[in-house]
Amino acid sequence: MNDWTESESRAELAHQLYQDGRLAEAAAELQAAIEINPHNASWYFNLGLVFDSMDDSVRACEAYRKALEIEPGDAETLNCLGVDLTRMGNCEEALACFEQISQADPTYEPAYCNRIITYTEMGDHDQAEVMFYMARQLVAECPLCYYNIGNSLYVRGQLDRAVECWKQTLRLDAHHPQIHARIAEAYWAKGDLERAKRHYQADLRTDPGSVETLMDFGELLMELGQLAESGEKFRRVLEQMPDHSGAHFCLGELALQQERVDEAEQQFRLVLRITPDFPGAHARLGELLLRRHRRKQATRHLLAELRISGDDTAMLQEVGQLLIQARKTHYANTVLRRLVRLAPQDAQAHHNLAVSFFMMRRIDDGILHCRRAIKLKAQYPLALYNLALAHLQKGSLRRARRYISRALTLAPDDKRIRELSRRLGTTDIWSRLRLRRRGNDRGRKMRM
């Protein structure tokens, strides 16, 4: 067999392997064919397609660039390169690819359709809509155009319009990948959990093994309180991918909700063995260790979480509260001051910071942040309660009574608030009695 025949034979075998889903073998055969004959642009293009199917955008881009060195203006290759560059976040370079296509052939619709998602990634939603309407002038009803503009609308919070666009995609292409899952996400974001559930079920009927859909559906079921069904979805993920950290983490969350503490701890420790920097796992483990009064170990995990989570405000809030529970007041104070700098309009952040100041006996600083919390959220009975306690400690009974009265109006059934209100009422009565007695004593002396 001569070199030309062997290279063609390997390329044909690669095509068959690609059709069979044996992607790594297909890539190897194409690379062997290219090594024999490095001047065939189609083989580089096909190699790019194989790498795309393997979710390897970096190597796909390399293959497409090689193809373009041989055939510089090929529209399909430029289009695929633009798509991968968008996935990698190189949006300006992606736009250059699409614009090069449009200059050579203004009727090539994918160059407009794919620019919808590129502009969406850049946050330029006006241009995304321009591309949508330009694409529709060429192809009146393209399911991918509706899908892409739906993503833009979803990002902007225009959920109803996003759903309508995705339903158009569904009408035009009932088997469009993950279309039911996207509609489910929008309904979930709208708070319509039952409709979201129905669309996740529809997506799994189309693709029963979709790990992404199984994970999302499992979390939705957890939110619905359908814990047994939720756990079944996460276990289906683990059947395919035994080391899926997210599935183990969610099973730990389920166990925690059901007070199966040993199982929860086992799952969170397993998550950290698989992925040592998995977001949230150290915090959950710290929470469990606090329940078991193992404060030193809990603190170690909570501080590890801070190193992983960076400026994630939700995690700073959670870890700050847990450090307060662990009585690691100075650590908590540092975390919560950082949170307040990042989220100055967050009433809960100011309140938690106030609590840490109170625990450090910095009463005036605590009062300052409690008042800021109430300014941001007027109906905040817990902050009013703590403010009343702080003024009671300072001996400012009138202010303490005023704040506890407001708290009692907001939460009349709260036992702590009612008890403090009773105490302050009694204290106020005795204070007045002492004042009257002293006044009467002075009066009697004057009459003598």
For the regions a protein language model found, what residue spans apply to each?
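Register position in tetratricopeptide repeats
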Residues: Q19, S53, R87-M88, E121, ...
